[in-house]
Design a protein with these regions (language model features):
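A short, N-terminal "cap"/entry segment at the start of jelly-roll beta-barrel domains
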Residues: 1-40, 71
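Conserved short histidine dyad/triad with adjacent acidic residue
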Residues: 24-27, 35-55, 74-77
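Conserved hydrophobic/aromatic beta-strand scaffold that supports enzyme active sites
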Residues: 39-41, 60, 80-82, 101
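A short, compositionally biased micro-patch
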Residues: 45, 55, 63, 84, ...
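Glycine- and acidic-residue-biased ligand/ion/polar-headgroup-sensing regions
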Residues: 56-70
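Ligand-binding loop in jelly-roll beta-barrel domains
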Residues: 74-76, 85-105
Length: 105
């Protein structure tokens, strides 16, 4: 399972790898489709969110930058939260955030 879209010659801040765009949630996949682990870096613009997400495997959210709520759990930069497999959940930035999402497939 090789990673993709990551720097190899020099280090870079994780938050610099994806930029929020007004009116959307931007994403950068760090693994390939079909891998047993889906790693995605998400950038939420102010006012954007996702709801009704459910994954077959456990999902880990690591807040890279900003503040957010995952199922009403408050998170700040550096926080991590596990959402168990099959649990419907929503992600809402307060007001904008960058999040690393790791999901077991």
């Amino acid at each position: 399972m090789p990673f993709k879209n990551l720097p190899t010659g020099s280090a870079a801040p994780l938050a610099s790898l994806v930029e929020a765009r007004p009116g959307q949630v931007s994403s950068r996949s760090l693994t390939r489709i079909g891998d047993p682990l889906a790693a995605t870096l998400l950038a939420f613009a102010e006012g954007e969110s996702v709801s009704g997400e459910t994954y077959a495997g456990d999902t880990l959210y690591y807040l890279v930058e900003g503040k957010a709520e995952v199922n009403a759990v408050q998170m700040t930069a550096g926080d991590v939260l596990k959402v168990p497999a099959g649990t419907p959940h929503a992600v809402r930035p307060v007001p904008a955030a960058k999040i690393l999402q790791l999901s077991l497939i």
